[in-house]
Amino acid sequence: MVETEIGGRLRTSRRKELAVAVVQASPVYPNTTESLRVALAFIEEAAAAGAKLICLGETFLPGYPAWLDYCEGAALWNHPPVKEVFAELRANSIVVPGSETGALSEVAARVHVGIVIGIHERIEDGPGHGSLYNSLLFFREDGSLVNHHRKLIPTYSERMIWANGDAAGLRCAKI
């Protein structure tokens, strides 16, 4: 039991241990299919090692667009090489829900782990149609998607790719 004083009140709580795995690996940029294969393999490996919450990095599916900061002409309007790379990134971005989220949900339920993973999200219809978002998904160990957060304000060169998110995903979820 742990006792803490918060706001003049004494609170007692039971401390639980949680084994967390943080995956430090490279996706297969910008190939979502192969990056998902890599993610699923690491999730299964971490679960077998006893992890109960497995975290993969920002935009792991299909990978972070580091070219933004290194590609000559990345900010030029209507620049053909950049348009080509952006089109490939857009094509490999994920629709939520979709087959990729289905695969993540299935593995979470099968190996009984929580999964936190960053994705490039593509909006196909409705509000935000045509936009890409830097999103974070949290799957509970029963496979349910319990939080879907879009990065509020992409920074610097990220603004050339991602739209501003909203506060809908700023909430806590029980593990």
Which residue ranges define each predicted feature?
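A short, compositionally biased domain-edge/stem linker segment
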Residues: M1-R11
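A charged helix-plus-loop insertion that forms the helical arch/lid used to bind
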Residues: L68-S93
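Beta-strand-turn-beta hairpins that frame and shape the catalytic cleft
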Residues: R9-V20, C172-I175
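Active-site catalytic loop in hydrolytic enzyme cores
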Residues: V95-V96, E100-G102, E106, E121-I175
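N-terminal phosphate-binding loop and adjacent alpha-helix
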Residues: Q24-A41
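Active-site-proximal beta-strand elements of phosphoester/diester hydrolases
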Residues: E17-Y29, S135, H148-R150
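Catalytic metal-binding/acid-base residues of hydrolase active sites
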Residues: S26, F60, H120-E121
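Active-site beta-strand/loop signature of hydrolases that rely on acidic residues for catalysis
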Residues: S35, I43-E72, E88, A108, ...
